């Protein structure tokens, strides 16, 4: 199985840009590329899929606290491709707390036995780049840097200085560089990168990136490195789940709601349930279903359109009142509230929960956390431990009673606790994004309610 992992010394060094360029260049050479993303991010994976035509898979060792399961999922998705390309997250050794193996890119590299290509930001640096590469190469004896790509290089002469220094002071090969070019920059939004659905002229960007990578990076050497990787020897069986054949699961899928982990959707299909997409923006009503799943996204950007689609809002509220189970994450919670406040205006939402979502100018919650239901809920029984991730700028002001205790830990110590998550009838909503592969009991609890 050929594989590489694109990592960086820090966030903002150019991992995504380099990764996308490599994916496009490999695709143009005729390779079938399977993309992966370290961590819980939903947005970079949209870019990956736009280029490769294949769903990108999240590899997150916090959300799935089972090394063998992670390796098994990686193997399952990558074995039929010509090459697997993993995009890292943050800096190579950054994760949860100070443990370099806790939810970090480096841990995923070791778990999947994948060679690491380090992206170094070349802006305003020359010989010091060698110190960065040498330090990263020595930091973990179990992990070696297989190659380096320099980003944001000012000129050929600038690249020669950096390359010469790295090759003089380390034994890590320099595979090439990307020149500074504003045309390949990706604009940002409050949740990170702008979703692919709203980008224009994407194909031109991908083509430019591909041309730059092909011109300035030794792709043959990169492919050689990918072939030198160790094979995985994982025998972990796929998660055993109950049979829910015949269960109809309607899930929101449009520009406002599209944050879903591909493995979650695959696991739903593995139960035998039927996934039926619908659009809260465009459709008149929710499809006839036994279960409704509303993922995250950007309801605030489409608040007026969601407000104006009264028939859809009424049909979801009617489904709730009939007792059809509804599970909603983050943007889904905002949609199920009474209203959404955006730029001083209020827009009516579904109204399952009595609460107003208000957008703020900063991140309100960010990062991994552990949730514990304080009562029986749609996603878990009282006292159950559920791993998740929150990332949002909105606050949900409500009179509803929260049904979960949430906490953040750093290096074994609880650093923050709060309450969240709301259960009303058979409807559950929270800001928490979860991965179903962490525990089969979560999906069984949810679909069990839909089957009754």
UniProtKB/Swiss-Prot annotation:
Q: What InterPro entries has UniProt attached to this entry? A: CbiA/CobB_synth, Class_I_gatase-like, CobQ/CobB/MinD/ParA_Nub-bd_dom, GATase_3, P-loop_NTPase
| EC numbers | 6.3.5.11
The GATase cobBQ-type domain covers: 248-441
| Keyword terms, alphabetized | ATP-binding, Cobalamin biosynthesis, Glutamine amidotransferase, Ligase, Magnesium, Nucleotide-binding
Classification via Pfam families: CbiA, GATase_3
- Supply the Gene3D superfamilies for this chain: 3.40.50.880, P-loop containing nucleotide triphosphate hydrolases
Q: Which domain of life is it from?
A: Bacteria
GO molecular-function terms, A-Z: ATP binding; cobyrinic acid a,c-diamide synthase activity
Q: Which cofactor does it need?
A: Mg(2+)
**One GO BP annotation of this record:** cobalamin biosynthetic process
The site annotation (Increases nucleophilicity of active site Cys) covers 433
The keyword Magnesium appears for this protein: yes
Its UniProt entry gives the catalysed reaction(s) as: cob(II)yrinate + 2 L-glutamine + 2 ATP + 2 H2O = cob(II)yrinate a,c diamide + 2 L-glutamate + 2 ADP + 2 phosphate + 2 H(+)
* Pathway(s) of this molecule: Cofactor biosynthesis; adenosylcobalamin biosynthesis; cob(II)yrinate a,c-diamide from sirohydrochlorin (anaerobic route): step 10/10
Which residues are responsible for catalysis? 330 (nucleophile)
- What's said on domains? Comprises of two domains. The C-terminal domain contains the binding site for glutamine and catalyzes the hydrolysis of this substrate to glutamate and ammonia. The N-terminal domain is anticipated to bind ATP and cobyrinate and catalyzes the ultimate synthesis of the diamide product. The ammonia produced via the glutaminase domain is probably translocated to the adjacent domain via a molecular tunnel, where it reacts with an activated intermediate.
Protein family: Belongs to the CobB/CbiA family.
Other noteworthy facts: The a and c carboxylates of cobyrinate are activated for nucleophilic attack via formation of a phosphorylated intermediate by ATP. CbiA catalyzes first the amidation of the c-carboxylate, and then that of the a-carboxylate.
Write down the PANTHER family for this protein, in alphabetical order.
COBYRINATE A,C-DIAMIDE SYNTHASE (PTHR43873:SF1)
Stated role: Catalyzes the ATP-dependent amidation of the two carboxylate groups at positions a and c of cobyrinate, using either L-glutamine or ammonia as the nitrogen source.
Entry protein name: Cobyrinate a,c-diamide synthase
This protein's gene is called cbiA
